[in-house]
Amino acid sequence: MDVKRPKKIFTRSQIIDLIADGKVIVIYKNNVLNLTSWIKKHPGGDKAAYHMVGKDATDEMHAYHCDETVDTFTRFKIGEIEGPRWENLLPPIQGGIYAKGGHYGSLNNKNTSNKKTLDSKLDNDSSNSTSDLECLTTTNSCDSDISETEIANYKGIGFVPSVKPVVPQNQLVSKSNMDIVFPIIDEETKKKVIRNPKTLLNNYDNKLSQEDVMSLPALDYDSQQVLRDKYNELHQTIIDYGLYECDLWDYVREVTKIGSLFLYSLSFLKINQLFLSAVFMGMAWHQGTFIAHDAGHIGITHNYQIDNIFGMLIADWFGGLSLGWWKRNHNVHHLITNDPVHDPDIQHLPFFAVSVRLFQNVYSTYYDKILPFDKFSQFLIPLQKYLYYPILCFGRFNLYRLSWTHVLCGQGPRQGKAAWFRYFEFFGLSFFFYWFFYLLVFKTIEGGWNRFNYVMVSHITTMLVHVQITLSHFAMSTADLGVSESFPSRQVRTTMDVDCPEWLDFLHGGLQFQAIHHLFPRLPRHNLRKAQPFVIKFCEEVGLSYSIYGFGEGNEIVISRLADIGKQCSIFLDATKHYEGDLY
């Protein structure tokens, strides 16, 4: 007779202890999952999982994984949480610091006598006094000292000492305390002159954060749970309507379209019409990007190996770009969308900045390095509204660099079912550079100037996809509103859709429905338009603002945001000329 083992119940303090030991602990449907031994095998990359440490990742895990994968989650179960609902911890990669005994900690404090448990500090919203908040944010007297061993453990799960969260650890943001969490120093009311240029930046950024707090549903866990429940109902509706079922004939047409563009390019090359040949080559790459995107999200056959092989053939072998690099980058982007410190899709210094936080030498947790706001950045950012389109013309060359770095440095999974992709991609990228740069450009086209023009025209033609990618996020919120904000709230808040007629869908390749895509990343591209009415209704019911603009108007909004950030840069640089303190 089988004896059923009693459930292992983990208290909040016990889970904190595990994280303090460097364990990759994620909450899924009230189950405690320990992903530590498996993290290097994660096909989506280790960074994506690190951003879920200490959090209830149920919605994210369902959105990004098929049913077959979901069924494997319980293999990593080590117990269940105490209580009916989990309230998120700040992941160490985002600045969360924890010490043994269920305490939050400090890197500097030597006095361990003033420890406070996380339970006692959790959910201090309107009742939290100014002095209490200052204790959390500006002093070490409330914090527990962390040993060198614990720091080493943290580094194993993405922790970097220089990363500081905007919202204090375990602080719940609300309309009543937003003036404390996001303070704005007013010269007139405070009767003081702002001398520190960083205060100018913080005022600007905090004002935007306050506007977000006022426009969104309340960020307390009860309100966000209502939103999550509605989102799960929406997800079930999407499933019930069969929108996850992909019509493979759609992709037969896509491949035929790309093949036709490629053949046109070769035909024009044959008759020495180099300009037209280059344009059609760029158009083929442009359309191929959309298929690679769909395949990377396992949104075609929903079979991991088949979709990835298909995607790598299109991205690497035909387009010269690493699908593995894109997946590692893109998965983080989806989970921590538009965060200047964590989202690589808005980390484009020295060329672009969409948040003033990037003026402060932030440490990128994705690139594992400081993004310096150096003299070159200081020269370009005030001009970014003028340089936006010209710089995007050269975007594909940067993707070559990132692709080769990813493959040669082995930044993708080195274990598990995705480990062999690295070698397939290496040969794919090599093959692309052989057939395009050597056979087609060097061996077929005569004259150095003609070769140069061909390469430039073909690559500049793909500029449109870079416009489409940045259009979705560059003008949207970059605020950090704390760990209580739900997955659907963050995705809708940070993403813009593009209104276009159905006959023009082929040109946008699904990127016109980015808000819908961010809510349901595996949804086949050709079904996104069918899902739009359901998403609009959902946003109306829960009080989220669904942002959608025409392509022209959306571009105007992006340019306006770039101009505004550029203006703030000029103000900041002017203020630094009269400031003698340490900015960083």
From Swiss-Prot:
GO molecular function, one term: oxidoreductase activity, acting on paired donors, with incorporation or reduction of molecular oxygen
Domain of life from the UniProt record: Eukaryota
Biological processes annotated in GO: glucosylceramide biosynthetic process; lipid metabolic process; plasma membrane organization; sphingolipid metabolic process
Cytochrome b5 heme-binding domain ranges (all copies): 7-82
Keyword field contains Ligase: no
Bilayer topology annotation: Multi-pass membrane protein
Protein keywords: Electron transport, Heme, Iron, Lipid metabolism, Membrane, Metal-binding, Oxidoreductase, Sphingolipid metabolism, Transmembrane, Transmembrane helix, Transport
Stretches the record annotates as Disordered: 109-134
One family name in Pfam for this protein: Cyt-b5
Pathway: Lipid metabolism; sphingolipid metabolism
E.C. numbers: 1.14.19.18
Locus of motif Histidine box-3: 514-518
Catalytic activity: an N-acylsphing-4-enine + 2 Fe(II)-[cytochrome b5] + O2 + 2 H(+) = a (4E,8E)-4-sphinga-4,8-dienine ceramide + 2 Fe(III)-[cytochrome b5] + 2 H2O
Chain ranges for the short sequence motif Histidine box-2 as given in the UniProt record: 330-334
SUPFAM superfamilies membership: Cytochrome b5-like heme/steroid binding domain
Cellular location(s): Membrane
An example Gene Ontology CC term for this record: membrane
Family to which the UniProt record says this protein belongs: Belongs to the fatty acid desaturase type 1 family.
Known role: Delta(8)-fatty-acid desaturase which introduces a double bond at the 8-position in the long-chain base (LCB) of ceramides. Required for the formation of the di-unsaturated sphingoid base (E,E)-sphinga-4,8-dienine during glucosylceramide (GluCer) biosynthesis.
Protein name: Delta 8-(E)-sphingolipid desaturase
